């Protein structure tokens, strides 16, 4: 199962730059991180689910690209985001 609407709303509210912000890199990375964490839990139980693992790798790649973009454009926002989400550099 994916994230519920309530969970997404909480993540958006926490990482949004303005009240109606849903598309900033911070929000997108936070949502991708939540989905990645959810799928990681799935793989602890279903080790042979290679099809979903391929989707996980795409999500990780997409998150990496967004983080690289944010790092190029505004390094301080990037550093704040990885600290808030607990991601390594």
UniProtKB/Swiss-Prot annotation:
SMART domains: Ribosomal_S15. GO terms for molecular function: rRNA binding; structural constituent of ribosome. Residues 1-25 are annotated as: Disordered. SUPFAM superfamilies: S15/NS1 RNA-binding domain. InterPro entries: Ribosomal_uS15 (IPR000589), Ribosomal_uS15_bac-type (IPR005290), uS15_NS1_RNA-bd_sf (IPR009068). This is Small ribosomal subunit protein uS15. Keywords: Ribonucleoprotein, Ribosomal protein, RNA-binding, rRNA-binding. GO terms for cellular component: cytosolic small ribosomal subunit. Signal peptide: none annotated. Belongs to the universal ribosomal protein uS15 family. It comes from Alkalilimnicola ehrlichii (strain ATCC BAA-1101 / DSM 17681 / MLHE-1). Pfam families: Ribosomal_S15 (PF00312). The gene is rpsO. One of the primary rRNA binding proteins, it binds directly to 16S rRNA where it helps nucleate assembly of the platform of the 30S subunit by binding and bridging several RNA helices of the 16S rRNA.
């Amino acid at each position: 199962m994916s994230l519920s609407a309530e969970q997404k709303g909480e993540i958006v509210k926490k990482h949004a730059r303005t009240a109606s912000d849903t598309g900033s890199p911070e929000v997108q990375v936070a949502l991708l991180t939540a989905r990645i964490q959810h799928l990681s839990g799935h793989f602890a139980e279903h080790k042979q689910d290679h099809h979903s693992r391929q989707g996980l790798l795409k999500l990780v790649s997409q998150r990496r690209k967004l983080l690289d973009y944010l790092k190029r454009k505004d390094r301080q926002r990037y550093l704040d985001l990885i600290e808030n989400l607990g991601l390594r550099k």
